[in-house]
Every structure is written in C-alpha cells, then in structure tokens.
Amino acid sequence: MAGRHALVWLREDAQWQAVTSGAQPRLQQWFAAGLPAVVARGDGSQAPGTLRLGVPLPPSEGKQRLALQAHVAGIARCTAPLTLDAVMPHAPLAVQPALQALLAQAHAHALHPHVFGSFAWQALTGLTYVHAQSDLDLLWSIQTPEQACAVLTLVQRWEQQHGLRADGELRLPDDNAVNWREYAGNAQQVLVKSNQDCRLLPRAALFPARSAA
C-alpha cells in the first residue's frame, strides 16, 4: 500500500467515507475537480483494504484538514510527493530564487528532495496556500548517517542565507521518517514515524549496521 505523504487520485466510482464531521459535500467537490488526497498514517481504525487519507484546505477555508477513508480498489493513480523542481514554478516569485539555490545545492550532493505541505498543495491545486510565514516542508530520502548530516548542513546554511524556514523529514532506509530538526538535536532518542505509528527509538538504531568492507 501507499505510504505517508503519497498522493492519491480516486476513481469517480471510488468508495470512500468522510471521517471529519460534515466534510462529505466539500470532499465530493474536491474529488469532482480531479484533485488528490494525501495518504495519512494508519491508526488501526481503518477497515482492511482501506487507506486513511487527508485533504488540507487552503487558508481561505480555514486551513481545515479533512480526513477520510477510501478503499484501495478505488485508487486511480498514486504518486510520490512532488519534487522541488516541480513545485518551484508555482511558488511566489519572491522565493523562487531561494528555491532554485536549494535545488542546486541538493543536486550537488546527489539529493532529490520532495515537497509536501503548503508549497506542494499550491502547486497541485492552483489555490493559494503559501503566505509569508509558510514553511517549506521537505522530504529527504537518505541511506546513511553521512547523507543525513549533509542534509542538515545544507538546510541550515540555506535558512541562514535566505531568511526562510524549512521543515520536514528525513526518510530512512526502512521507509520510516524522523523530523530533521529533531535529528539535528542532541537527544539520544528521536520520534520515528512509520505508516502505522510513532515511537521513540535510540538514535543509534536509525540506520542498519553496515558490514565491514
């Protein structure tokens, strides 16, 4: 099944049910417009063969996040989160140079960040999500502690240079994720998010032991 942050488009005849009270009519409008939902973390309440999905509404609609459950059989298309280069043309013009600089720095380290949150939803919908205080939410897929350190250094330097704030997660080799700011701290345990739950794990357990050459 699709994991957290994946984008899902439903078939016209898909079976789904709003979890947020009173959200059914707005969700019907949303899907009728051909817009996607995002896969949320399972909480054990969903029926077999279903996914928990979310639809975050724009600030003009109160930034409410609408929750629903949908049958997997009703999925027409499922993709990874948008890439930073796909999001960039839809961002406010004032921040596009900073995003271009971040993309160039990431590529120099063979990193290819994906985007979720307000910048992604503005690109996906054409609606206004991004405002002056919006964070840039990034998902970095990494394989080693060295790559994690490279991401931390890159993002912290970028924030200082451009006066913008980046939030987001490091996606670990086992497909779990940890908030990059929390990883950058000194705590011996960090909160790790999977597709089913959240749990505290020792920092040393985040990367599998690599065999000696």
Curated annotation (Swiss-Prot):
State the InterPro entries in the record: Holo-ACP_synthase, MdcG_C, MdcG_N
**Which Gene Ontology molecular-function terms are recorded?**
nucleotidyltransferase activity
* Regions that span the bilayer: none
Query: What Enzyme Commission number(s) does the record list for this chain?
Result: 2.7.7.66
- Spell out the catalytic residues: 135, 137
**What UniProt keywords apply to this chain's record, in alphabetical order?**
Nucleotidyltransferase, Transferase
Against Pfam families, the record matches this protein to: MdcG, MdcG_N
Annotated catalysed reactions: apo-[malonate decarboxylase ACP] + 2'-(5''-triphospho-alpha-D-ribosyl)-3'-dephospho-CoA = holo-[malonate decarboxylase ACP] + diphosphate
What job does the chain carry out? Transfers 2'-(5-triphosphoribosyl)-3'-dephosphocoenzyme-A to the apo-[acyl-carrier-protein] of the malonate decarboxylase to yield holo-[acyl-carrier-protein].
Similarity comment text for this entry: Belongs to the MdcG family.
Task: Output this protein's name.
Answer: Phosphoribosyl-dephospho-CoA transferase
Q: Which gene encodes it?
A: mdcG
